[in-house]
Amino acid sequence: MATLHFSINGRAFTVDADPQTTLLTVLREHLDLTGTKYGCGEGQCGACTVLIDGKAQRSCVTRAAAVGQRQITTIEGLARGDQLHPVQQAFLDEGALQCGYCTSGMIMSAVALLDRNHHPTQSEIVGFMDGNICRCGTYSRVIRAIQKVANEQVVTGTAKAVGR
């Protein structure tokens, strides 16, 4: 066991865990942040996606000890009080969820995409989201939701504010 220190969703956490434990295990089992889902356990499906220093990463294959000094954002860290993050709201508006299992990973990947590319083409969206699998087949709605946020950024001039 080791004492691990984290910055998650803007808050400091200390956890006693095996350094080889995955970030996903720390989030779900030690910190009760269950919005991040376990899918495949191999980094292939995207259900466990979180942001580490603003980049989409698979938490099921990320060792907790490797991210101690980095900024981690989970799905729980996106909304501000009762106000959903623009990507969360767009997913809701466009019906880009069914069973909901992949939704948090999809949203986290979409946030990472829009933070680095404020106006992605449909092809860029499809390419970036390729690592996120949806068993229910909501891909066209996911693309529409991401395009909606990108288009609203153009209208409102909030491109730099999408991550928060």
Model features per residue range: what roles?
Residues 1-164:
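Signature of N-terminal electron-transfer/Fe-S-associated modules in redox systems
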